[in-house]
Amino acid sequence: ALIDYFRKYGDKYDIDWLLMAAQGYQESRLDHAARSAVGAIGVMQVMPATGKDLGVGDITEVEANIHAGIKYMRWMMDHYYGDEPMTKLDKALFAFASYNAGAGRISQLRKEAAKRGLDPNVWFHNVEFVVADRIGSETVTYVGNIYKYYIAYHLLIEARDEREQAREKMKNLNEGAP
């Protein structure tokens, strides 16, 4: 299932798999049949040329598509933000913004954020304000949606785990009852 691929490649590339699943949801609603007007393919909406460059196999296959999307995000995080004094989450958020608006543009806007007295290494309530001001809401909405889906996925996983723990406790209580 999709979750297994997100876990596998999230682990391989040291990126929170829930964050990548959230990006997949933003890109395609996790629909591997999705195709964009510009030719992006699958769950992660990978362009064929990018998929070929990444060397992960046939991106028309769901596993290779998810592999490509996660590998590409890891490359963006390392290439553009690897040496930046940011949290892992901010590196991912800036990589998403760069994916959406272009790394050069985001780099310029980080510098502008610093000039405005904002933290150029923090996305939320800092660089996102400059991005919204200079290029509009699309990138801010894109990154914000991914983060909202990420939080929702986290809450769902926590609730599931709590239910399983409660069931196990009830089972143990029932087994110990006379």
Describe each model-derived feature in a short phrase.
Residues 1-178:
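Catalytic glycan-binding domains that act on GlcNAc-containing polysaccharides
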